[in-house]
């Protein structure tokens, strides 16, 4: 309900200032929250066309397009993948410190079948770039890749390193989930939980 009210306000504001970037971005964000990918795509597209050097607009556009592709049938999704990849790559080029875009590329290259551009090598490249920007993100990304390929022992090493540095809810959840659901090691999972709750 709050989103609907906000959407009305922003839409009204846009009538008087049709090119107000922040307003267009908010409308895109609201649409994204409501999983209205078409509206999100339309708003972010306006922004990336008007501000082609803004990495965040490219990232958000690629993200909304990627979510739409995930919910579309296979043939339709195939036609969208190149543009999703291109948007993320543009964002990464425009901003060498953009963490979210590098995460998006890691996930994209890991989840895509090899025949349409998926590649562990490419995913590792962006995991390395993440490592240079933030050790926690780097280890989490490498752990994510290991989990995807069922290399759970390697994933444990990476997730443990991420947790030692970050000691956050995110690093805890990744390692805990690995122990509990992948390595099926309740003892390790419970020990980790106790340590995290008593820190």
Set out the residue ranges of the language-model regions.
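TPR-repeat structural position
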Residues: 3, 37, 81, 120, ...
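Residue at a conserved register position within TPR or TPR-like alpha-solenoid repeats
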Residues: 31, 65, 72, 109, ...
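Canonical tetratricopeptide repeat
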Residues: 22, 26-29, 60, 104, ...
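Helix-start (N-cap) detector for alpha-helical repeat units in TPR-like alpha-solenoids
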Residues: 21-22, 55-56, 99-100, 135-138, ...
């Amino acid at each position: 309900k709050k989103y609907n009210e906000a959407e009305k306000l922003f839409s009204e504001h846009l009538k008087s200032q049709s090119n107000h970037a922040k307003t267009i971005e908010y409308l895109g964000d609201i649409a994204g929250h409501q999983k209205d990918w078409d509206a999100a795509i339309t708003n972010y597209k306006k922004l990336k066309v008007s501000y082609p050097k803004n990495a965040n607009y490219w990232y958000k556009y690629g993200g909304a397009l990627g979510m739409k592709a995930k919910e579309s049938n296979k043939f339709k999704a195939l036609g969208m993948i190149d543009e999703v990849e291109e948007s993320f790559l543009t964002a990464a080029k425009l901003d060498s410190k953009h963490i979210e875009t590098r995460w998006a590329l890691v996930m994209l290259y890991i989840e895509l079948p090899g025949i349409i551009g998926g590649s562990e090598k490419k995913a590792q490249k962006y995991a390395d770039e993440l490592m240079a920007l933030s050790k926690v993100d780097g280890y989490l990304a490498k752990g994510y890749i290991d989990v995807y390929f069922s290399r759970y022992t390697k994933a444990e090493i990476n997730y443990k390193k991420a947790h030692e540095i970050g000691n956050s809810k995110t690093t805890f959840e990744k390692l805990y989930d690995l122990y509990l659901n992948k390595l099926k090691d309740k003892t390790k999972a419970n020990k980790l939980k106790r340590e995290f709750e008593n820190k």
